[in-house]
């Protein structure tokens, strides 16, 4: 069976009011493009799973207990069958209409296309702290990305092998992929205000975890094995 052209991975946690709307938006945005939608329910405590609209190309993965956004993304990426994998949040703040822009960047030669929120629809404090965090992170890990907090990304399937699975890796996908030698581009995308539900992240839990993770990523970058095979020689037989 021929795989789809793109796998769209969406982590979900308590998004009962958003998931059906998001599914419809993704269907409309990717109309005419063969795709699969992988929804990963991170043990939601509301009716998220029952609100998923079942149908062809829709896959629902469910965790038995809450494992976090990184775990949900990893499960979705590993389950993906397409050569291109798209990531976006389930809270409707990412605009699925931007997916084709990032997919085109992959078709044009990039290995990972990252969106950055050109006009963020968050409060002033969140924008300021995010700007500071992005600056510090970019300088420290050297990924050159202005907005790693933007979940909207499309990558070649091969990039998944560069991702070291640890809690919080989703904040450092560009750094991990770039350090493995893949080509990254960043493009402006739309950002929408949250309509339903509440943000799962606060300033405190993001700052402390991100700082610890940043040190770990820097260590991984320094310790990454870099060895390219340039030739292969057949052993000489004893009879020669």
Task: Go through each PLM region and give its residues.
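A general structural signal for well-ordered alpha-helical segments in protein cores
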Residues: 70-73, 99, 129-133, 160, ...
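Residue-level signature of the cytosolic catalytic core of signaling kinases
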Residues: 44, 54, 65, 121, ...
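Short, flexible, basic/aromatic active-site loop/helix in glycosyltransferases
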Residues: 107-161, 178, 212-215
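Residue-level marker of alpha-helix boundaries and capping positions
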Residues: 39, 93, 150, 164-165, ...
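Structured catalytic core of nucleotide-sugar glycosyltransferases
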Residues: 1-124, 158, 182-186, 227-240
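Conserved protein kinase catalytic domain
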Residues: 9, 40, 74-77, 103, ...
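Short secondary-structure transition/capping segments
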Residues: 73, 126-127, 157, 196-202
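Hydrophobic helical membrane-anchoring modules
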Residues: 1-3, 142, 166-240
